[in-house]
Curated annotation (Swiss-Prot):
CDD domains for the chain: Ribosomal_S15p_S13e
PROSITE patterns: RIBOSOMAL_S15
Functional description taken from the UniProt entry: One of the primary rRNA binding proteins, it binds directly to 16S rRNA where it helps nucleate assembly of the platform of the 30S subunit by binding and bridging several RNA helices of the 16S rRNA.
Pfam families linked to this entry: Ribosomal_S15 (PF00312)
Quaternary structure (record): Part of the 30S ribosomal subunit. Forms a bridge to the 50S subunit in the 70S ribosome, contacting the 23S rRNA.
Lineage, highest ranks first: Bacteria, Bacillati, Actinomycetota, Actinomycetes, Acidothermales
UniProt protein name: Small ribosomal subunit protein uS15
NCBIfam families: S15_bact
GO molecular function, one term: structural constituent of ribosome
């Protein structure tokens, strides 16, 4: 379940630190969060889709690692990001 181009551009515009920024942890976490949300909605309907459930767990793990990296690098950016995304922590 890939993100469409318009959604991706809007996320990039909101979370990018500079023009053309696609690799900063903030952007990566925001994109992963959107994919996780979409997959969660899919799994509410298709409860027995175990293949997608495994993909969801991999995405959550990748997001957790990026958040841990950001917390070690710059705690202020980390706190700002989780506040903007509405993540628990």
């Amino acid at each position: 379940m890939a993100l469409d181009t318009a959604t991706k551009r809007s996320i990039l515009a909101e979370y990018a630190t500079t023009e053309g920024d696609t690799g900063s942890p903030e952007v990566q976490v925001a994109l992963l969060t959107r994919r996780i949300t979409d997959l969660t909605e899919h799994l509410k309907v298709h409860r027995h889709d175990h293949h997608s459930r495994r993909g969801l767990l991999l995405l959550v793990g990748r997001r957790r690692r990026l958040l841990r990296y950001l917390a070690k690098k710059d705690i202020a950016r980390y706190r700002s990001l989780i506040e903007r995304l509405g993540l628990r922590r």
